[in-house]
Regions:
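C-terminal-most transmembrane helix of multi-pass membrane proteins
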Residues: 2, 247-295
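Membrane-interface helix-cap regions at the ends of transmembrane helices
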Residues: 2-5, 50-69, 135-147, 189-208, ...
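Transmembrane alpha-helices of multi-pass small-molecule transport proteins
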Residues: 10, 35-82, 161-164, 184-199
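Loop-to-transmembrane-helix transition segments
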Residues: 10-18, 57, 62-86, 150-160, ...
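Helix-helix packing/entry segments at the starts of transmembrane helices
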Residues: 100-105, 172, 176-188, 223-254
Length: 295
């Protein structure tokens, strides 16, 4: 077996593990969302992730945390945390698979914002991916009487803001290593979300506290596995594995809440995943750091 094939298999393993961890995080957040409000969930998820992430960064010392791009880190954090608020609110309203699929459809919107904000050329493949993806999202939303479920639309907003965060990461990709981006994102999100969390703070049970600690742990290690996976294998080659999170989310929803999806929605899921894979492969020559947006 060639070195390239070994790297591809190892990269796929890291990514599948990462998305299993992140889908498990989603399940824990859904447990907490039955009692806790979204501002608290967003803050606790970031705070506990930061507590876990800091020791790892200082022990490994993979890169300096000093940066000259603080403004861009703030923009990336502002767009990323907006996506997070939308996603975590949605996760308490929709079945887990729906919330995850809609929020992780960001690659579909990326070519549009790359064209508008970075003046990147949009090729035919990327254009088709956007159109196919939007069709899939409409099928998943399943409009009733001409009106979309507002909760599902918030999930789409999560994907849109996540794609904007990817754009800001791309603008930093020449100077900022992935570990530094992850550090500033987690730090700034913890600080930004602390204020609304303080305003809306409420008592929580031991179960919810443990769920949030677990979510922070899974988020931190999920991000680290993502970074590792994309560092050893070409993003365009391993792009299909990112949608394993939808399968894991569907499994958790079925096991824990007996959530099921019908045939029509299942077809929409497949269409969105295919569109996301096409969009990712169409941009596979971009820097690997573009791919590591994690809500």
């Amino acid at each position: 077996m060639t070195l390239k094939n070994n790297n591809l298999l190892l990269g796929a393993f890291y990514l599948i593990t990462a998305f299993f961890l992140l889908s498990s995080m989603g399940a824990m957040l859904k447990v907490a969302a039955t009692e806790l409000n979204t501002p608290m969930i967003v803050f606790l998820r970031n705070f506990f992730a930061l507590v876990i992430l800091l020791p790892w960064l200082f022990i490994t010392k993979k890169c300096s945390l000093k940066t000259d791009r603080f403004g861009m880190h703030f923009v990336r954090s502002a767009t990323g945390i907006t996506a997070m608020y939308c996603f975590f609110w949605t996760i308490g309203k929709l079945i887990l698979a729906d919330a995850i699929l809609l929020s992780y459809s960001a690659p579909i919107f990326l070519p549009v914002f790359a064209y508008l904000l970075l003046k990147d050329k949009v090729n035919l493949t990327s254009s088709l991916a956007v159109i196919i993806g939007l069709i899939g999202i409409i099928i998943v939303l399943q409009p009733s009487k001409g009106i979309f479920d507002p909760s599902a639309l918030v999930g789409v907003l999560a994907a849109i803001f996540a794609s904007l965060a990817m754009i800001s990461i791309r603008k930093m990709s020449n100077t900022e290593p992935a570990e530094r981006v992850v550090f500033y994102f987690t730090l700034l999100c913890s600080l930004i979300s602390a204020i609304p969390a303080f305003i809306y703070w409420q008592p929580m049970s031991i179960t919810n506290l443990l769920a949030m600690i677990g979510a922070g742990f899974l988020a931190a290690f999920g991000q680290l596995f993502l970074t590792k996976g994309y560092s050893i294998a070409p993003p365009g080659e391993v792009a299909p594995f990112q949608y394993s999170i939808v399968l894991f989310g569907t499994l958790w929803g079925w096991l824990l809440w007996d959530e099921r999806i019908d045939l029509i929605k299942g077809c929409g899921f497949i269409i969105v995943c295919i569109a996301g894979i096409i969009a990712s492969k169409a941009n596979k020559k971009k820097h690997r750091i573009d791919e590591i947006e994690e809500i």
